[in-house]
């Protein structure tokens, strides 16, 4: 009998898969977008705003991986204002350019131009849509499908809808356009304004459409998923945390999806949009500004972040191999840093080897670990120095900085009112349990949370008898972190042991083992060993999983040994 133990244990991958580096200027104008040509060059479009006349589009080319740019053409129409340029390269090598073209509030067009000579000359081809106002047409975005071409755009021309996102399909390379499809619209109409659409095909074959929703928060960013890029669920999609206004999305071959917006932060998803994390280091330190950013996969291991700020500029980043999270994970903050932690709101500091959350009158949290951690034991030493409550979060996904309960997670903490509290945060607070205990100010308490499936045991001071035992299955996986609510608190000796992510599944048929797992295999290998050691030591058995029905799948020959261990490990 063959005994197969699938660990996947602790070998999940550390955050920030991009290391930002050099910058370059593309053009002195505004609103930049790019496209990769079939010969390896890149083409860019930028808006030029000359004094005393209407704006026009400048076309630029780079032959050295986007480092240097030369203007080669312009597209200009007398009496019309042009902006929001968008490029796409067709399978036959032709390049299409679309844009918004308007005369005040009386004429709106989305014209299409074609170039057959690498962008040096342009010929009018067609018009996607038109409006005589006052509702306008804005921000077109192309998508090449298997045998057709799609375009998405913001549309103000429908009565009863402040704005919606329209889609049209061309079956002849942009010469003619089919009937309008409503990709995103407020159910029943109203004042909400979905717009600025961007779409990309992910590594699992599905398409993700991202967009802003003006009059919802600060132009909150949301997304929809489609298997064919033409069939869309109703409504306004699913919110993406930490991003607002003017989103842009791209996907890389490894499976990671990257997203940015006018927050000028970059978020990434390793599970095709189900959960999102924010990079600790942004490409540009602009804060929230109307920079109309974009992201491009400019090389096999390179991501470029484009912003319009003092001209159109690019910053290049290396897609770096992600180091494995250690098991156990531990941080005592003795170095006076919180490397590998991501801060959300709040005020942070360090003193005497402790992590300070100085949040009297406010709130804040800091997160670390893998978004795929599921079971394990979380511990910390906690001292609260002003009235309020503080504690730990776990199984957190989609964290945001828009309030004390922004994210999806469990929270266990101590309150100086004299109790331990356990609850759920899902952009709102839902209390599960409390138990009375003495919580004195300026006194250190040791907390321990043991999580196994839907069972949670919460310990404080006494590590033998849990103060709270509770069953709840709301959240299955996520990061860990520390949180302070309306108080100053310090944390020390944070640890997470026996970390287990979502399961590595295995099926055995006809002498073959087939492993599947639901997240992106970025720089990982499947490892195997006949004996367990600490740390795990083994040999790689394969490196090239494939996508089958949204699961990463990797077949290997059934081993001869009677006992075999398998796990995923960072390269």
Which residue stretches match the model-derived regions?
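Hydrophobic core segments of beta-strands in well-ordered, beta-rich domains
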Residues: 33-51, 84-104, 111, 139-161, ...
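Short, composition-biased motifs enriched in small/polar/acidic residues
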Residues: 498-571
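Short, solvent-exposed beta-strand-to-loop segments that form ligand-recognition rims
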Residues: 460-479
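Secretory/extracellular carbohydrate-interaction modules
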Residues: 359-425
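Short tryptophan-centered beta-strand motifs in secreted/extracellular beta-sheet-rich domains
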Residues: 333, 378-380, 443-452, 456-460
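Short, aromatic/His-centered strand-loop micro-motif at the edge of beta-sheets
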Residues: 425-446
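Asp-box/BNR beta-propeller loop motif
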Residues: 16-22, 60-72, 113-126, 169-181, ...
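Extracellular glycan-recognition surfaces and repeat-rich motifs
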Residues: 334-366
């Amino acid at each position: 009998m063959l005994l197969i133990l699938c660990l996947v244990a602790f070998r999940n991958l550390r955050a920030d898969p991009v290391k930002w580096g050099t910058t370059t200027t593309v053009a002195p104008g505004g609103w930049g977008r790019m496209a990769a040509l079939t010969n390896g060059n890149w083409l860019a479009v930028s808006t030029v705003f000359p004094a005393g006349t209407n704006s026009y589009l400048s076309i630029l080319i780079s032959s050295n991986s986007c480092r240097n740019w030369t203007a080669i053409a312009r597209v200009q129409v007398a009496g019309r204002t042009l902006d929001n340029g968008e490029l796409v390269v067709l399978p036959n090598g032709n390049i299409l350019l679309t844009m918004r073209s308007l005369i005040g509030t009386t004429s709106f067009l989305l014209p299409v131009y074609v170039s057959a000579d690498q962008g040096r000359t342009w010929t009018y081809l067609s018009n996607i849509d038109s409006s005589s106002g006052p509702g306008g047409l804005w921000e077109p975005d192309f998508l090449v499908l298997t045998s057709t071409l799609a375009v998405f755009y913001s549309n103000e021309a429908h009565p009863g809808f402040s704005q919606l996102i329209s889609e049209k399909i061309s079956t002849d390379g942009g010469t003619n356009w089919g009937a309008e499809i409503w990709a995103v619209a407020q159910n029943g109409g109203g004042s909400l304004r979905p717009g600025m659409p961007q779409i990309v095909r992910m590594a699992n074959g599905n398409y993700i459409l991202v967009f802003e929703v003006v009059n919802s928060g600060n132009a909150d960013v949301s997304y929809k998923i489609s298997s064919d890029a033409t069939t869309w669920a109703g409504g306004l999609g699913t919110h993406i945390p930490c991003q607002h206004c003017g989103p842009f999305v791209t996907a890389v071959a490894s499976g990671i999806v990257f997203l940015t917006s006018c927050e000028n932060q970059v978020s990434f998803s390793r599970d095709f949009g189900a959960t999102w994390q924010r990079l600790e280091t942004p490409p540009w330190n602009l804060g929230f500004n109307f920079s109309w950013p974009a992201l491009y996969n400019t090389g096999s291991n390179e991501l470029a972040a484009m912003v319009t700020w003092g001209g159109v500029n690019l910053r290049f980043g290396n897609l770096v191999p992600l180091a494995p999270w250690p098991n156990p994970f531990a941080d005592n903050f003795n170095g006076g840093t919180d490397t590998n932690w991501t801060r959300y709101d709040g005020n942070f500091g360090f003193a005497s080897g402790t992590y300070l959350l100085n949040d009297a009158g406010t709130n804040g949290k800091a997160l670390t670990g893998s978004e795929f951690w599921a079971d394990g034991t979380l511990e910390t030493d906690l001292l609260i120095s002003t009235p309020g409550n503080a504690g730990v979060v776990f199984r957190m996904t989609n964290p945001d900085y828009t309030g004390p309960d922004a994210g999806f997670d469990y929270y266990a903490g101590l309150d100086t009112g004299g109790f331990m509290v356990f609850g759920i945060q899902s952009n709102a607070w839902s209390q599960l349990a409390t138990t009375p205990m003495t919580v004195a100010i300026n006194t250190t308490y040791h907390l321990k949370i043991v999580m196994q499936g839907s069972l949670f045991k919460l310990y404080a001071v006494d590590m033998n008898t849990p103060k709270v035992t509770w069953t709840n299955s709301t959240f299955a996986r996520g990061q860990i972190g520390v949180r302070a609510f309306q108080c100053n608190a310090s944390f020390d000796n944070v640890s997470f042991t026996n970390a287990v992510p979502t399961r590595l599944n295995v099926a055995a048929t006809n002498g073959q083992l087939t492993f599947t797992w639901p997240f992106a295999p970025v720089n990982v290998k499947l490892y195997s060993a006949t004996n367990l050691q600490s740390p795990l030591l083994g040999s790689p058995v394969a490196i090239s999983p494939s996508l089958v029905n949204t699961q990463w799948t990797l077949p290997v020959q059934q081993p001869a040994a009677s006992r075999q261990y398998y796990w995923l490990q960072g390269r």
